[in-house]
């Protein structure tokens, strides 16, 4: 096992992550260890990932077609990383390709632009989706949404109804593997079987799923095969700017590449262009070589830790957090609040403190406790409005305010999310902070910036230039 990537132990307060011992200033003076409850947004880098980057940099050169030693070594590392990614998701290499890009958003946009849609085609998606797995499809086909239940889960009966109602027109079922809002894990293989039964393919946004559970795309012809999977390294403890699309080759063998330029061609004249083979034809320009290698090392770390240990670690943290929240007056948890179900979901908990705006709760957690959370709608506006029971009339009123640059009343929740960097001590600190907020035991001087929808304190202005300079 690699140094810096040892298996997690919940009793330990820290794992070997870059910045795990960082101390941040507090409103009342002094500092506190930063408590990262924001892994659903992005993750800190594993120490072993940083070490892998350091190992590569002395040998870094551009990939492909270079004959120098450094170029050949970098090319070798880049392609070995591609192989590791394919193995990580269980891709059928005879029919699937691994394409590197910037992030999950770009991966799904690229698929939406390159997929061979026909007039009248339908993309079936759900109200649970992150905007990145909904907005790109609007430009490509008719989008039909599957409803969610009162508990925020995808309505399976509505899924079947809409697959049947649009049979023959549904080309893609585009779904999230796990919700970035409620942490629900979706039965994507079962949904793949249902989609394939009506002649559709399935796209899985695995941005939230990939760091926490194994993925098995399965072989071509398997009724439960996942045809397309997208995810990002920055959510997998390798925040160096890489996203991945693992795709059926057929969608990219037709037509011109999405991005054209150097490396995508075999030969160019003033009159003609001949594209090279996949995957190079879809990766024009110099790729993020360092980021790709970092992702491969992070994958190795996760596999060595083991998925059962990862799931057990995060389930213990999630159950402890839910139990603590249930004991605090005024805490409202959205979605499944049962600690007994922590093992069948991710450690993503949306909540509010009754009577306290979500933006104020997040500000107090940060300024007075050194806890990093996130608040708002998490790039899933329709889903959050649904679980908050926001009416259509309220929604239209809020839209008018936002378009007038007033975000003071935007609906939302606070989101605490856990990963391998967290310990039970982190949960305890979060619990003590929420107890204080529930009692209204926090500084009364916070001011709302209506245009940004954020609370700040006039007496607290950290000098970030002391921490980082270009």
Walk through the language-model features, giving the residues of each:
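Pyridoxal 5′-phosphate
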Residues: 1-470
């Amino acid at each position: 096992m690699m140094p810096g990537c040892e298996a997690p132990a919940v009793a330990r307060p820290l794992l070997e992550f870059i910045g795990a011992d960082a101390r941040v200033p507090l409103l009342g003076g002094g500092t506190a260890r930063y408590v990262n409850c924001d892994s659903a947004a992005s993750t800190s880098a594993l120490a072993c990932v940083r070490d892998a980057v350091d190992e590569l940099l002395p040998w870094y050169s551009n990939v492909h077609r270079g004959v120098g030693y450094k170029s050949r070594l970098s090319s070798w590392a880049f392609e070995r990383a591609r192989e590791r990614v394919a193995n990580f998701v269980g891709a059928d290499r005879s029919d699937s390709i691994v394409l590197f890009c910037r992030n999950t958003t770009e991966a799904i946009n690229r698929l939406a632009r390159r997929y061979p849609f026909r007039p009248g085609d339908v993309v079936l998606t759900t109200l649970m989706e992150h905007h990145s797995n909904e907005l790109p499809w609007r430009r490509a086909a008719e989008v039909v949404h599957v409803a969610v239940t009162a508990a925020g889960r995808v309505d399976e009966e509505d899924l079947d109804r809409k697959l049947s109602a649009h049979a023959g027109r549904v080309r893609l079922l585009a779904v999230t593997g796990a919700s970035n809002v409620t942490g629900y894990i979706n039965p994507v293989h079962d949904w793949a079987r249902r989609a394939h039964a009506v002649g559709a393919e399935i796209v899985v946004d695995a941005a939230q799923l990939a760091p926490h559970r194994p993925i098995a795309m399965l072989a071509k012809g398997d009724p439960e095969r996942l045809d397309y999977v997208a995810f990002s390294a920055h959510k997998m403890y390798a925040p160096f700017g890489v996203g991945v699309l693992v795709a059926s080759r057929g969608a990219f063998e037709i037509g011109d590449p999405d991005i054209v330029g150097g490396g995508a061609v075999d030969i160019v004249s003033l009159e003609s262009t001949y594209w090279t083979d996949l995957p190079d034809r879809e990766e024009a320009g110099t790729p993020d070589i360092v980021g790709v290698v970092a992702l491969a090392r992070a994958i190795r770390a996760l596999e060595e830790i083991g998925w059962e240990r990862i799931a057990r670690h995060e389930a213990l943290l999630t159950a402890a957090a839910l139990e603590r929240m249930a004991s605090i007056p005024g805490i409202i948890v959205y979605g499944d609040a049962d600690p007994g179900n922590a093992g069948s979901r991710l450690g993503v908990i949306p909540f509010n403190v009754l009577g306290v705006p979500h933006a104020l709760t997040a500000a107090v957690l940060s300024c007075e406790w050194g806890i990093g959370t996130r608040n708002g709608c998490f790039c899933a506006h329709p889903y959050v409005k649904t679980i908050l029971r926001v009416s259509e009339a309220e929604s239209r009123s809020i839209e008018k305010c936002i378009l007038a640059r007033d975000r003071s009343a935007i609906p939302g929740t606070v989101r605490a999310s856990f990963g391998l960097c967290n310990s039970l001590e982190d949960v305890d600190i979060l619990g003590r902070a929420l107890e204080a907020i529930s009692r209204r035991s926090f500084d009364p001087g916070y001011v709302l910036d209506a245009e940004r929808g954020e609370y700040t304190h006039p007496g607290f202005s950290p000098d970030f230039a002391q921490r980082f300079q270009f």
